[in-house]
């Protein structure tokens, strides 16, 4: 494979090293902040590109073309007349105002670029804040690329999947800083309030080598609101009929033309127990969370400096279990089954970047992040505590080779993870503490013919005290064969250390005995590292239907594991086996999507997804459990025109439909008949809706409903009458455990 890379680079490096007639420039927002990934193309042609990490672009100018079109999600499309080769400075305006984008909940803020090399979907805050109380785990309900499922019927925790694989195989990053690793893997998505997020970039398949070696099925990167562009004050209040109450507040202060700071505060609470299905267990955990973030930004565009400093503290407490459980008297006893998960997190991170003023294609950046994450928890008589202290650092340099057709990024990064991990169960008790250290170097080359073809080839070399020394290659290719069509291919390798207990701690809420089968000399719980290759192909076509904008996309991705830590729940209903893969394990994912804007303010999106995920277990090659093969998705959003004579008032409506096909369940064949489930869970459908009344630019209210179809899983928890017995299991959750849920709230801001 490496010979192929060298041969390909050798072919393409000499191309077009002579002067060309091209246009270059930069794209910024209304505060002169660079817009990364903005689309820039010549009107009436298929020649385009996307802006780089500094918002800069270079584009070949075809004969007869004189008008550039620039677009970015959440901003008005802009056309620019070009008369010569003078560098352009293009400033985009928000679709309404930036403040309205921050708190707008309309669905249409999703963009699939035709000119980015990787298969990236960008979601703005209008898409993310669809669920009024949302945290990051609830931000994907209107995006068919991400599946959101409950991990079990007790903790209420949500887990996401991409390309048929669960979140440990997805690299989660905050502003390209890897996060939610190890100790925070299970609950970390619920620790990021949705109102803090400016945008999310979803990358399917192999990611960039710049961000590390762990990504296998894809990457999800979220951007936090920037102090330089934030509004002075924002408030969101929320209440639901399942007794959840939430407050989000942001306050911003611009200290000078270069310095600004924002304080983010979030709190939620649920203290009233409810048991609507009368199984003796509460439907949702009770508890509370306090979440604070102080963010500082420095920006000096003339001198080329930009910097961020983040101080973050979070404390989350949740209690689940039987309705009659009282932790003061029942913890550690068999009086009543209960669980408590208490998490505390503190992090400090900074990012410094410098763009050379005379050569804007050259830049250097430094990232540092320190995190401390502590979780104390128990599930019935099973005890699990983990404290992880982590450091991540990344130094990157960007420049060109000869001209802007040939760009490269190179640098160093390192990680340090100190795990203090203790597990106490009837079958497995021990101290699994360890220290992981790694250092790596990367080089990524980008070729763009400034027209219809580009590719990114990257390689990194890492040394890890437990994973060894290894190479990670990755490749992305983009080709525009005809007008408004984009064809992409990607391939890459990923390697990671499986945190067996932290990533599967929901299984502790059952009677299953944990058994780790080592024996191969593995350094991680006696097991070997996980290694996989991901290959993908995608096609995107934009077109008109009766004069209305429409888009169709289809993609196929396959993941092949060289080694995987297999989680086997089929050997016995009373056991959870963990062992190295001995055979084949793969995940095939096919997705087709269609979207159209049939009328002004009206958007429609529909998608179909097919999964084929199989693993070699002790009992043979079997489908992955709790993974539907078929899924249908549809979303309709409508906004009435703004009434400018009436304080910009309007109505917003949104409806989302999901249908999930049957899913294989872990075997319960050896249980007594009363505690057996069928081999497959039935298909089911859910419907969510939200109505927003905007009274003015500063005030709006909303009401909504989830699971309006009122589908409820029967027997979500096995053996509720004997939770300390051998057949208790809360991990068979494939559908909602409770029925319809309605909520209401308000949003207020000072502009």
Q: Where are the predicted features?
A:
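Flexible loop and strand-edge segments within Gram-negative outer membrane beta-barrel domains
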Residues: 270-291, 297-364, 370-388
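C-terminal beta-signal and adjacent terminal beta-strands/loops
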Residues: 495, 562, 659-668, 692-751
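Gram-negative outer-membrane beta-barrel transporters
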Residues: 448, 553-560, 580-666
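N-terminal periplasmic accessory domains that precede
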Residues: 85-91, 136-139, 158-161, 187-193, ...
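Short, acidic, small-residue-rich periplasmic hinge/interaction motif at the N-terminus
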Residues: 28-33, 38-43, 71-75, 83-129, ...
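Short acidic/polar hinge/loop motifs at secondary-structure boundaries
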Residues: 57-60, 159, 177-204, 292
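Extracytoplasmic beta-strand/coil segments of soluble accessory domains associated
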Residues: 60, 137-178
């Amino acid at each position: 494979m490496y010979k192929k890379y060298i041969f390909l680079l050798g072919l393409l490096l000499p191309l077009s090293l002579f002067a060309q007639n091209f246009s270059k420039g930069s794209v910024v927002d209304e505060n002169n902040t660079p817009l990364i990934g903005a689309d820039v193309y010549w009107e009436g042609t298929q020649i385009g590109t996307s802006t780089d990490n500094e918002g800069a672009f270079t584009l070949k100018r075809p004969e007869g073309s004189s008008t550039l079109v620039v677009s970015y999600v959440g901003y008005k499309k802009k056309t620019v007349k070009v008369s010569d080769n003078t560098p352009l400075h293009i400033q985009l305006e928000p679709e309404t105002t930036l403040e309205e984008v921050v708190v707008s909940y309309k669905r249409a803020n999703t963009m699939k670029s035709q000119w980015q090399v990787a298969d990236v979907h960008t979601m703005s805050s209008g898409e993310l804040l669809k669920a009024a109380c949302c945290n990051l785990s609830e931000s994907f309900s209107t995006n068919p690329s991400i599946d959101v499922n409950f991990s079990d019927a007790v903790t209420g925790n949500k887990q996401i999947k991409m390309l048929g694989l669960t979140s440990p195989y997805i690299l989660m990053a905050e502003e390209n800083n890897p996060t939610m690793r190890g100790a925070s893997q299970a609950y970390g998505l619920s620790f990021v309030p949705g109102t803090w997020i400016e945008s999310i970039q979803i990358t399917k398949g192999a990611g960039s080598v710049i961000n590390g070696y762990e990504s296998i099925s894809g990457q999800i990167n979220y951007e936090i609101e920037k102090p330089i562009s934030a509004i002075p004050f924002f408030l969101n209040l929320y209440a639901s009929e399942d007794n959840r109450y939430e407050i989000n507040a942001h306050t911003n202060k611009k200290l000078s033309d270069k310095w600004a700071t924002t304080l983010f505060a979030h709190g939620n609470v649920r203290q009233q127990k409810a048991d609507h299905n009368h199984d003796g267990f509460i439907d949702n955990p009770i508890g509370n969370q306090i979440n604070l973030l102080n963010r500082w930004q420095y920006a000096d565009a003339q001198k080329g400096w930009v910097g961020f400093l983040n101080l973050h503290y979070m404390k989350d407490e949740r209690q689940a279990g039987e309705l009659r459980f009282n932790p003061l008297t029942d913890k550690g006893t068999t009086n009543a089954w209960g669980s408590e998960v208490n998490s505390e997190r503190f992090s400090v991170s900074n990012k410094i970047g410098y763009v050379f003023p005379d050569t804007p294609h050259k830049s250097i950046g430094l990232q540092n992040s320190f995190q401390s994450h502590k979780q104390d928890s128990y599930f019935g008589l099973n005890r699990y505590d983990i404290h992880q202290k982590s450091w991540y650092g990344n130094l990157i340099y960007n420049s060109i080779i000869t001209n802007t057709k040939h760009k490269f990024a190179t640098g160093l990064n390192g990680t340090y993870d100190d795990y203090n991990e203790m597990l106490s169960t009837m079958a497995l008790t021990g101290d699994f503490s360890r220290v992981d250290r790694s250092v790596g170097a990367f080089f990524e080359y980008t070729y763009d013919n400034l027209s219809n073809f580009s590719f990114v080839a990257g390689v990194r070399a890492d040394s890890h005290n437990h994973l060894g020394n290894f190479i990670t290659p990755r490749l992305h290719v983009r080709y525009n064969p005809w007008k408004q069509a984009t064809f992409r291919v990607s391939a890459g390798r990923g390697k990671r250390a499986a945190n067996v207990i932290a990533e599967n701690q929901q299984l502790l809420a059952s009677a299953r005995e944990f058994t780790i089968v080592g024996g191969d000399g593995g350094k991680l719980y006696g097991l070997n590292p996980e290694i996989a290759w991901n290959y993908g192909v995608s096609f995107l076509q934009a077109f008109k239907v009766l004069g209305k904008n429409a888009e169709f996309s289809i993609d196929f991705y396959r993941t092949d594991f060289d080694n995987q830590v297999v989680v086997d729940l089929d050997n016995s209903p009373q056991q959870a086996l963990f062992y190295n893969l001995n055979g084949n394990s793969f995940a095939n994912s096919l997705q087709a999507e269609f979207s159209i804007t049939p009328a002004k303010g009206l958007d429609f999106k529909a998608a179909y997804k097919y999964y084929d995920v199989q693993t070699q277990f002790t009992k043979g090659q079997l489908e992955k459990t709790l993974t539907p093969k078929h899924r249908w998705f549809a979303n309709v959003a409508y906004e009435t025109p703004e009434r400018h004579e009436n304080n910009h008032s309007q109505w917003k409506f949104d409806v989302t439909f999901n249908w999930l096909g049957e899913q294989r369940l872990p075997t319960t064949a050896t249980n007594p008949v009363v505690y057996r489930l069928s081999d497959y869970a039935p298909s089911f459908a859910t419907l969510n809706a939200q109505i927003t009344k905007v009274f003015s630019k500063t005030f709006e209210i909303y009401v909504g409903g989830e699971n309006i179809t009122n589908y409820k899983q029967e027997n979500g928890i096995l053996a509720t009458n004997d939770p300390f017995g051998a057949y208790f299991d809360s991990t068979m959750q494939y559908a909602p455990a409770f029925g319809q849920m309605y909520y209401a709230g308000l949003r207020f801001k000072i502009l």
